[in-house]
Amino acid sequence: MSTPLQGIKVLDFTGVQSGPSCTQMLAWFGADVIKIERPGVGDVTRHQLRDIPDIDALYFTMLNSNKRSIELNTKTAEGKEVMEKLIREADILVENFHPGAIDHMGFTWEHIQEINPRLIFGSIKGFDECSPYVNVKAYENVAQAAGGAASTTGFWDGPPLVSAAALGDSNTGMHLLIGLLAALLHREKTGRGQRVTMSMQDAVLNLCRVKLRDQQRLDKLGYLEEYPQYPNGTFGDAVPRGGNAGGGGQPGWILKCKGWETDPNAYIYFTIQEQNWENTCKAIGKPDWITDPAYSTAHARQPHIFDIFAEIEKYTVTIDKHEAVAYLTQFDIPCAPVLSMKEISLDPSLRQSGSVVEVEQPLRGKYLTVGCPMKFSAFTPDIKAAPLLGEHTAAVLQELGYSDDEIAAMKQNHAI
């Protein structure tokens, strides 16, 4: 089966989550991704949050499937020579080291262009080069704080909150992936590679665009009618935290379901659509609300939206969350159960679709990983296990033309 990126070679100089999530997707699309790791150590996530002693952690295995791993010491002359040969044959190089790290290895963008003018150089940093925070070390929650997510997440009477979703890390990797694929297409037209940079702050901000929309509306109006603070609360000069509100034109909230007293996830998310208000009233046994002026329009409902949700919750709290969703769906009401990670890991539909995949790695054995979220009609990504540290060092060096004796000498000289 042919794959979209078959024949594309990627040098993966990334670690932790933002870079590996990008290069893993390239590997799923068929690229030959060579993960370059420090001899004897490897990606730091191999050792972080281990569940089995002395075995690659799930943190690593779930972000590095389908790749090849080589151990290479680029501080040695032999290591630099290998690196130059790899660059000469590669299509893409991706890195997410601290600013200047690749330059200090002797591989500036200018030098890389001299070696291989067709190479596409992908780079992830916490902040853009023109940012006052350019030298700040960035991780997931740092990016969420600086990108506008934290200030707009949480409840109005509490502190800013960070999201459990990897808005700063994996999201940045997905944004860079888009840029790299665009650069590959551009190379088909120009014959030359280019540098693609992605800041974690920018990636978070791109997902917070509706909050930038709301800031401009707030500046003009002094209020935001879809937020729970309207009309009885107060608005400051910045977009407030809205709790579980929908954030768009459709009010929504988390509602209790049967068993909530002991099950922390016995809830559903319920959305009220203006165009579906009549069905909503019928579903919750409030047909009089359809024509009642206090409820018949979104503008009329907003002042007592929490009273409305409390009334709806009187129904949802009597039934299981899955039963609630099944019932409400008959009335075309947008809703979903709050699914725990335990439920997601056991969901047969996610296994069937390939969204959750079981793979097997030597030493670790079988484990679950997230599969490719995109579903293609012409091919299905074959999700394979993450590589062991240095598993493919000899094979990659042989492909570059090194003999067994030369490889043995490099090992003795601590170049690999």
UniProtKB/Swiss-Prot annotation:
Per the entry, what this protein does is: Involved in the catabolism of oxalate and in the adapatation to low pH via the induction of the oxalate-dependent acid tolerance response (ATR). Catalyzes the transfer of the CoA moiety from formyl-CoA to oxalate.
What PANTHER family does its record include?
SUCCINATE--HYDROXYMETHYLGLUTARATE COA-TRANSFERASE
Residues holding CoA: 17-18, 38, 72-75, 96-98, 104, 137-140, 273-275
Q: Which residues form the active site?
A: 169 (nucleophile)
Q: Which terms are listed as keywords in the entry?
A: Transferase
Q: Name one GO molecular function term.
A: formyl-CoA transferase activity
Organism of origin: Shigella dysenteriae serotype 1 (strain Sd197)
Which family does the UniProt entry place this protein in? Belongs to the CoA-transferase III family. Frc subfamily.
How does the record describe its quaternary structure? Homodimer.
**Annotated Gene3D superfamilies:** Crotonobetainyl-coa:carnitine coa-transferase, domain 1 (3.40.50.10540), formyl-coa transferase, domain 3 (3.30.1540.10)
Task: Summarize where substrate binds, as residue positions.
Answer: 248-250
Q: What is its EC number?
A: 2.8.3.16
Task: Name any Gene Ontology BP term.
Answer: oxalate catabolic process
Q: Which reaction does it catalyse?
A: formyl-CoA + oxalate = oxalyl-CoA + formate
Record-given protein name: Formyl-CoA:oxalate CoA-transferase
Q: Which Pfam families match?
A: CoA_transf_3
Supply the HAMAP family for this chain: Formyl_CoA_transfer
UniProt pathway:
Metabolic intermediate degradation; oxalate degradation; CO(2) and formate from oxalate: step 1/2
According to its UniProt record, this protein's enzyme class is transferase
